[in-house]
Structures are given as structure tokens and as C-alpha cells.
Amino acid sequence: ALANIYYDKKKYSEAEEWYSRAYKNGIIDAAFDIGNMYFNVEAYEHCLYWYEKAAKEGHLKAQNNMGVSYFKLREYKKAEKWLVEASDSNLPIACFNLGVLYTVLRDEESACRYYKKGSTMLEENCKYNLAIINQNNKNEKDAISLYKYLHKIGNDKGCFNIGLIM
């Protein structure tokens, strides 16, 4: 709790000191928190160090964030490794991030596979991106179905796009 107070006051060295103490006492989330602190100031090399400590202990969000950090560093193979690991453990946001990675790599088939997987876990952004792909591929029936779902749950982008199609 003290680490969070320092973090909120942007006293990062003090926050890191207290998070480190917590980590040394067996609190894996503390390594994740330090990773987030560095991620938020775009110090990706530092955040990776801390995320890896948590990720190797099975912390799914740390695995996902390692993938995102590597993505930002354009180290796509490393990003893929960590995102696949988190996605294989059914973390919905990892499915979305993996879909984005495959979209950037122009592997639409793999992107769709992970967007579909995330969609089954009700990850809105997966449904939206899958709808866009369906729309771009002239599969309006599936696109409309996804946009209707997004409209029903109040997703603004889904509401806007269904209006464009219909």
C-alpha cells in the first residue's frame, strides 16, 4: 500500500523501493507493479526486467505486458512468444494483442484466429477488429452480427460502424 501511495505521488524511486521489498517477501504482483511503473514512462527495457520475474511465475498479465513491451520495441518474435503464452492460458486481452501483432505482420488468418478466440471470451476489441476484417472482406453478414452485439452492449465504435453498413 505504501508503494502505491508513492507511485500515485510520482515518487517512483520510493515506490520501487517498497515494491521491491514486497517482491522479496514473495509478493509476485509487486514485480508486475514495478513493471507497470516503468511501462507507463516508456522505459521498456526496465519494465521487461520486472515483468519477466512475474511472468516466469505464471502471472498472465505480466506475460501479456511483456508481449506488448516487446511489440513496442518491434521485437515481434519475442512479443509473439509471450502473447501466445498468455493467450494459451485464456487471457482475453492477450488474444486481442496477439491479433494486433498478426495484423501488423499481415497474417490475417492468425489475427482472425486470435480475435475469434478473444471474442468467445467476450473481449470487445476482439469482436470489433473481427467485424472490421469481415467488413473489409465483404462478409457483411458476420460483420453486422458482430456490430449488433457491440451496439447492444453500448460500444460506440460498433454503433457507428453498424450505421455505416446498414
Model-identified regions with their sequence ranges:
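Conserved alpha-helical positions within TPR/SEL1-like repeat arrays
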Residues: 1-7, 29-39, 61-71, 93-100, ...
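Short helix-capping/linker turns of helical repeat alpha-solenoids
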Residues: 25-27, 57-59, 89-91, 121-123, ...
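Polar, enzyme-active/binding microenvironments
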Residues: 46, 50, 59, 82, ...
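TPR/TPR-like (Sel1-like) alpha-helical repeat modules
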Residues: 114-122
